[in-house]
Amino acid sequence: DDLYRHGMDVTCVSGVTSVEKPMWIDLDIQCLDPNEMLLELKTLAKDKIDVWVHTAAVLDYVIEEQIEGKIASLQGDLNIGMKEGAKHILELKDLCKGAVRIGFKFESGIKQKDLVHRAHAQIKTANMTATIANRLEDYGKEGAPRGWLVDSHGAHFILKTELDMCSAIRSIIENHR
C-alpha cells in the first residue's frame, strides 16, 4: 500500500492467504500452488522489472504426494511426507540481475544476532539488495521492534514500527534506482 501511495506501480503475486489485498491493485496474480507461483514469477521476470519485494517466503516444505479427493474415515493414522520446496528467491536470482531486490527473513526461536546473520547470508546467496528480518516472538509484542533492516554489508538497523519498515523499503528503492 505504501509503495502505491508513493507513485509506484505494484503487481502482486500471491498464494493462499488470509490477508485481504487492497482494491487498488490492478494486477493481482493468485496462485494456489508454489510451483505455479514460481512459473508466474519467472514469466514476469522477462519484463525486466526494476524492483522486486519478496514479502513472504513461499512454503519451506510442501506435501510430497498429494492425494486427490477425500480420505475415508476410520483408516487409522495418517503419515504425510513433506519435502523441501523450491526457494523462489534463489530461482529468480539470475532472472532479476540488475534489479533492486528486497527480501524478508522470518524466523522463530533464535537470537537477534543470529537472525541478522541469516538475513545477511540470504542477501549474499540470493543476490538481494537488502533484507527485512523479523521474529515470530516479537510480532505484535509491545515494545518489540517490527524488525531489522539488513544491508549487503551486514549493517543492521532497528525498525520500531510498520511505518519504519515501509519507509526503509521505500528508501532502499529510491537510493538504488
Protein language model features and the residues they cover:
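A cross-family phosphate/adenosyl-ligand binding-site feature
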Residues: 1-177
